[in-house]
């Protein structure tokens, strides 16, 4: 959004809700619970991902495989298939949770209207249906409420997608007005960082490296840093606090 970058579904959902509050992503007023589901959906995704990797990674073109290995450095692509039965059981266990939630006849996971919960859950069911339809049929067997929900999700469509290349994205950030962010540091935060400290923000569940910048926001739900890069100029990058590690830069 201009010269601000929002990382992870948790923050993207909150920003979308702020910019476009109607229709709400949280129609039942349960934003905290639904945002917590983002972390659950990470585990659902992991089960689907490892099933697909174990069955198909050897068939991918080498450049694409290398790219995926860089994206998921904590997964050993050569051996992930050894535990295929375990990951299939995990996927089915996650899918059972959806079936259970829908078993009272509700149309959507949070009730009468679609919400962030549906957005968080559906992609991994669709991923399995698309990549491994025969396996998906077995893994989702007997989940009739989930199957009906899938059709409702598909009936909503996917909106209008606008493609943008990386050079255009960089140019948009450079051209955006400088971001004025009020310094907002939680006095009760256990790490006791102060505003202006050079920090690294990185996912706490992978080793993909982090982003370095000047700390401007540190709250229970968010950390934001200001950084300057020749490709994009000066930007403020926002991360969720949940699932991200903040440490002093070397």
What are these regions (language model features)?
Residues 162-195:
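Mixed-charge, Lys/Arg-rich low-complexity intrinsically disordered regions
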Residues 39-155:
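GST-like fold's C-terminal all-alpha helical module
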Residues 113, 124, 165-169, 204:
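Histidine- and/or cysteine-centered catalytic micro-motif in compact active-site loops
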Residues 1-70, 78, 193, 200-203, ...:
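GST-like domain detector, emphasizing the conserved glutathione-binding G-site
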Residues 95-98, 173-178, 199-202:
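Short linear motifs at secondary-structure transitions and domain/linker junctions
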Residues 25-33, 160-171:
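Short, flexible loop/turn segments with low-complexity composition
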């Amino acid at each position: 959004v201009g010269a601000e970058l929002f990382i992870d579904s948790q923050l993207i959902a909150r920003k979308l809700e702020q910019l476009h509050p109607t229709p709400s992503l949280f129609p039942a007023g349960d934003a905290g619970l639904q945002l917590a589901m983002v972390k659950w959906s990470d585990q659902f995704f992991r089960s689907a991902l490892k099933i697909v990797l174990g069955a198909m990674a050897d068939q991918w073109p080498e450049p694409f495989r290398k790219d995926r290995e860089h994206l998921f450095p904590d997964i050993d692509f050569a051996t992930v298939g050894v535990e295929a039965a375990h990951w299939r059981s995990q996927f089915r266990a996650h899918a059972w949770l959806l079936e259970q939630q829908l078993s009272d006849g509700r149309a959507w996971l949070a009730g009468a209207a679609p919400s962030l919960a549906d957005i968080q859950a559906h992609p991994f069911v669709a991923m399995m249906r698309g990549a491994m339809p025969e396996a998906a049929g077995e893994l989702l067997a007997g989940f009739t409420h989930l199957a009906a929900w899938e059709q409702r999700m598909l009936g909503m469509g996917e909106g209008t997608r606008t493609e943008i290349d990386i050079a255009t994205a960089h140019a948009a950030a450079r051209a955006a007005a400088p971001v004025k962010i009020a310094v907002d540091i939680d006095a009760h935060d256990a790490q006791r960082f102060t505003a202006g400290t050079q920090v690294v923000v990185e996912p706490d569940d992978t080793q993909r490296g982090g982003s370095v910048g000047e700390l401007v926001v540190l709250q229970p739900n968010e950390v934001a840093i200001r950084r300057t890069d020749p490709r994009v100029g000066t930007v403020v990058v926002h991360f969720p606090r949940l699932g991200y590690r903040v440490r002093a830069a070397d």
